[in-house]
């Protein structure tokens, strides 16, 4: 009986730690379907949104979600305006110097979208073309690093890049492959206009991003992610939002 009481008290102490007691603010840029976006009623939804809500259940966390602009999202986290980023945030060495990341919850590659039927063999084929992307995402970094002579046009919202592509004001868009496939295959207003012309070979991985030193919170998130991967919940979310668990 004493042992059972001790275990119960330990569990209660864990549940009443500061992380469990307060409501955590989760931020994301809801302009990146199918990962994070808004419904017609302006409700945040998508793969990352479903994922972080399931994490919260498993980790005994109270969360509220805030839609914020991508430009400045890291500054807001550093300033304490929110506690977690759930925004298709690629884990990079540069970002890891300033922030902590969970274990990966999704793997992506960069994709180039062009008018229907067009294909390219490498980023080098974008030489002389105008390529749209969103400010500060890894697609911009990848294209700049490749230095192929493309003109990069950056937008506040990836959707605006696709609108310009549809209107013929640009030649291509580069972004993460789930987003590229969504705009090429699932957006009714762009039906039949685009195709994924190229998939870059280098993989990148998304993690939930936190301020340095949030050790307890990081451990809770990682434990929940690992359990979701082990019991098939992650795969089910991939099928729901991307159509495949691959």
Predicted regions and their residues:
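Alpha-to-beta junction loops
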Residues: 60-62, 79-87, 129-130, 148, ...
């Amino acid at each position: 009986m004493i042992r059972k009481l001790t275990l119960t008290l330990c569990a209660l102490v864990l549940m009443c730690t500061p992380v469990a007691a307060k409501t955590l603010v989760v931020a994301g840029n809801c302009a990146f379907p199918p990962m994070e976006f808004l419904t017609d009623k302006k409700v945040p939804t998508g793969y990352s949104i479903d994922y972080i809500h399931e994490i919260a259940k498993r980790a005994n966390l109270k969360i509220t979600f805030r839609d914020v602009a991508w430009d400045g999202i890291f500054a807001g986290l550093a300033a304490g305006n929110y506690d977690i980023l759930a925004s298709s945030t690629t884990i990079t060495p540069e970002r890891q110097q300033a922030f902590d990341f969970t274990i990966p919850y999704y793997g992506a590659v960069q994709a180039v979208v062009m008018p229907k039927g067009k294909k390219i063999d490498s980023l080098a084929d974008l030489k002389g073309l105008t390529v749209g992307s969103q400010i500060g995402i890894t697609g911009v970094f990848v294209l700049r690093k490749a230095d192929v002579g493309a003109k990069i046009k950056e937008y506040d919202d990836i959707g605006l890049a696709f609108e310009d592509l549809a209107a013929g004001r640009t030649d291509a868009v580069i972004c993460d492959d789930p987003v590229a496939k969504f705009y090429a295959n699932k957006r009714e207003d762009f039906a039949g206009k685009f195709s994924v012309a190229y998939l870059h070979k280098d993989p990148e991985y998304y993690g939930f991003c936190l301020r340095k030193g949030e050790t307890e919170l990081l451990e809770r998130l990682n434990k929940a992610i690992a359990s979701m991967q082990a019991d098939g919940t992650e795969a089910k979310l991939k099928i729901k939002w991307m159509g495949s668990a691959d």
